[in-house]
Amino acid sequence: MCGIVGILAERQVAPLLLDGLRRLEYRGYDSAGLATLVNGHIENRRAEGKIDNLASRLEREPLPGTVGIGHTRWATHGRPTETNAHPHVTDKVAVVHNGIIENYRELRRELEEKQHRFQSETDTETIAHLITDYLNQNMSPQEATAAALKRLEGAFAIAVIFVGHKNLLIGARRGSPLAVGYGANDNEMYLGSDALALAPLTNRISYLEEGDWVELSPGKAIVHNASDVVVERKIHVTALSGAMIGKGQYRHFMLKEIFEQPAVIGETLASLVDGQGRVALNDLPFDWNSVPRVTIVACGTAYYAGLVAKYWFEQLARLSAEVDVASEFRYREAPMPEGGVALAVSQSGETADTLAALHYAKAQGQKIVAVVNVPQSSIARLSDVVLPTLAGPEIGVASTKAYTTQLTVLLCLAVSAGLARGVLSAERADAIMQCVREVPSMINHVLRDEHHIQELAHHVAEARDVLYLGRGLLYPLALEGALKLKEISYIHAEGYAAGEMKHGPIALIDERVPVIVIAPSDGLF
């Protein structure tokens, strides 16, 4: 997932852009680059690999300028090379881009027939030449951008700077998030893929809506909707700060976030209960007794949280629950019951497939509930109810604290549903919530055994294949454990329902395959 930063200021922006890109490293990337307007023309610096490589190049070849854009790229169209890295530059513009332009081949052929010369294999360069083509027709930067946006098909966010316009920075979004930042210095304005990239610069953020494009000038943002009508977008004051995003005493962000779990689970739980520790959610715009089914849509780790929630809704609320991978659900055209609830789970609140699934569910008349870590996100804005996880910024690529806070919210929601439907007694609900209140201290107890966990990890690290097994509620945990091992160690791992081991997986097990069984003391073990 790529990252965008754009800055318009009165000071040199290259160091600020580089710092913003470092804050977007968690999104994953294989190359990075910057472009600024220098003495009336555009200069750029790009590098393969780590941002440190780009920083080294900037030390050798400094990049002045008071307006600029930066990008971290994860290759989709074209190999991860310096030539394919962003920004892409013509004699009139520089462009950075997240997402995919689906009709770039047709546009590229059209532009090549007009003698536009392409240097890269990317779809992004097509945007730069398309805007340039409209500029060559004597359009203004704003007119050229609006015209180009109408030709582009796909999901994307872009940022553009223009030769001869040192006080102009344009951004646009369609299916990919883009935030506008307002500087403490009234003359500074910012663009970012998310608020994290802008955290050290400002806490005043507005989020572009689907189809919006924005023109930034000193101290001013003019937002246009998809019909090019000027609109207002609310400015939010975020709680993020540069200090919150540091690694502190930890070697890497994921380890830091693992150790933050007790605190953030406690904070999330405190937001969902009253003074007696009982679930106390805000009024919901539906009656649980009239809900025929809950449809949970999510991706990756959030999907596994949804699988756990399915068990809770069925067992605690006696309510039918369906869980779907959002990337599959959005294309299935599944029938949805009248009066149903669609529940979206997403750390960022910007997961494109989950957002598309919710648009479908909303069109089917479902009430939308969002469990997200970013209350101002696109998914949150689309929803009827937002139940935030208070995990704080999650920088590590592999989700940890967001997952456990999602489970906290989902359990409280299922308990609330069970009580409302009259199928869960107050006594049992109190007992469940007492157990939940003990979770932070239990996690602390496990984390104190870090040395033993490291010893076990050394044994697993030598394996080529690992099997995770669980039953009931813990089957989704087995799936999540296998996903984490794959993400972090690149060791092949699979999660299975324990009862299914004899139906295939057992044939692959020998003395070299570790089997990790999640086996608590319950009715199944």
PLM features: residue spans?
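Conserved short alpha-helical segments that host acidic/polar catalytic motifs at enzyme active sites
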Residues: 1-247, 251-252, 260-292, 426, ...
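Short, solvent-exposed amphipathic alpha-helical segments in soluble enzyme
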Residues: 20-24, 85, 113, 174-177, ...
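Glycine-rich oxoanion-binding loops at beta->alpha junctions
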Residues: 66-83, 271-286, 309-345, 351, ...
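Generic beta-strand/beta-sheet core signal
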Residues: 96, 161, 172, 181-183, ...
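Short gly/pro/ser/thr-enriched loop/turn and capping motifs at secondary-structure boundaries
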Residues: 117, 124-128, 178-180, 198-199, ...
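Active-site phosphate/pyrophosphate-binding segments
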Residues: 261-265, 269-295, 364, 385-516, ...
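Glycine-rich phosphate-binding loops that contact phosphosugars or nucleotide phosphates
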Residues: 289-438, 518-525
